[in-house]
Amino acid sequence: MTGRIALLSLTLFSPLSLASTPDGQALDFTHSTIGYAALLIFAIAYTLVMLEEYLQLRKSKPVLLAAGLIWAMIGYVYQQTGSTEVARQALEHNLLEYAELLLFLLVAMTYISAMEERRLFDALKAWMINRGFNFHTLFWITGWLAFFISPIADNLTTALLMCAVVMKVGGENPKFVSLACINIVIAANAGGAFSPFGDITTLMVWQAGHVSFLEFMDLFLPSLANYLVPALVMSLFVPHQTPSSIQEVVELKRGAKRIVVLFLFTILSAIGFHAFFHFPPVIGMMMGLAYLQFFGYFLRKTLARSLAKKTAIAMAKNDEAALKRIGSVVPFDVFRSISHAEWDTLLFFYGVVMCVGGLSLLGYLGLVSEILYTEWNPIWANVLVGLLSSVVDNIPVMFAVLSMQPEMSLGNWLLVTLTAGVGGSLLSIGSAAGVALMGAAHGKYTFLSHLKWTPVILLGYVVSIVLHLLLNHQSFT
């Protein structure tokens, strides 16, 4: 049993993720030199990923190299056994999985980048700053906004936006910054758990067809409880002070609100293709990219006329500041927004997909699946997945589960979606939002400051699981 637990830990603590093999005569290399070498390469690669902040080494680099080495070894051993076609089919299958993920995320990131370029998030930040809220009110406002924005935007962007407000208003109060950042991380992760667009893990579960778009809403109340339980406790310790008033003026660029509407239509297109035609949602997302491209064309073609009107108004009012802003206007370019996508993250996903493809073909994921989902009760296995995601990034953990293809009820698929999404809140290093805020609020929000509240966050984790088991018990049959 000890040996199996060790193998389980080693497997899940490396980026074993998103790959699965098609039907074919895959060979078992779990007890071979090649298999052990693959595990060692994964362990080293993931160690480097975890040390990204300290080494200043982008996380995509080690997993890209690991993927190449693993598949080179697989190619060699399958060539020796005369089964090259099996390995090639597995490789192509995983490349297709990655292509769907890449294009979907690229469109979503492009829209978020376009909203940032049109200053939509800057305007939201300025609105909160100008209201002169006290620390207690700001604690709740940033938390609620993080919870409700992250299902549409990604939780990382949401967390960074809310943290910018906290640092701008209360940066001189370390206690408030620490509590507010913890609250934001919990809220962003919890909010992302009940929407396919809120987190990469929920997106993958949706694309795999295990949970429909509307069925994700069954996780709303458990996710809400996951946020509210620790937030209510922490709010008792927030300083009851009012920071000095700051006035900040932000003018939205032309087309900002219409881009939000186009993004909503893009989401509806993705849902429609998946619901009505059973096509991959990425088809609707790519169609949505065309919406943005044509709108960008419209903005460029009408820019001169728009600037002429604004210039005439500014000259009539003798507004020098407005004239200066008009003179610095840069035409909207959708390809600039595409270039601002998080390419390190997208390449990291490639490494994760191919690494797990190799592990799956070598037989390790089948072995781990046997331990987790056959010998254990799936409910306890899914609770463990959430705890693992507090140490290991939830993306490789969830991709590993998807690659195992366990036979589970809808309730258990919802449970693993919930736990993988919110489990990362237990530690600051457990989610991209937490890691990013440690950098944005350096010295004020730290690993140790988050760790002090882990028992309260764990209480919220347990309450959310129990609430899901009670409210959605019919989906476990």
Curated annotation (Swiss-Prot):
GO CC, one annotated term: plasma membrane
Function: Na(+)/H(+) antiporter that extrudes sodium in exchange for external protons. Can also transport lithium.
GO function term, MF aspect, one: antiporter activity
Protein's membrane topology: Multi-pass membrane protein
Effect of E251A: No change in activity. Shifts the pH optimum to more alkaline pH
Residue intervals annotated with topology Cytoplasmic: 52-60, 113-132, 172-181, 239-258, 300-344, 404-413, 473-477
TM segment ranges: 34-51, 61-78, 95-112, 133-150, 155-171, 182-206, 221-238, 259-277, 282-299, 345-362, 379-403, 414-438, 455-472
One protein family per Pfam: CitMHS
Name this polypeptide is given: Na(+)/H(+) antiporter NhaD
Mutagenesis / variant outcome for changing D344E: Decrease in activity
Effect noted on mutating S428A: Decrease in activity
Effect of mutating S389A: Lack of activity
Result of changing E342A: No change in activity. Shifts the pH optimum to more alkaline pH
Consequence of changing H93A: Shifts the pH optimum to more acidic pH
Activity dependence on pH, as recorded: Optimum pH is 8.0. Totally inactive at pH 9.0.
Mitochondrion in keyword set: no
Family: Belongs to the NhaD Na(+)/H(+) (TC 2.A.62) antiporter family.
Originating organism: Vibrio cholerae serotype O1 (strain ATCC 39541 / Classical Ogawa 395 / O395)
Designated gene of the protein: nhaD
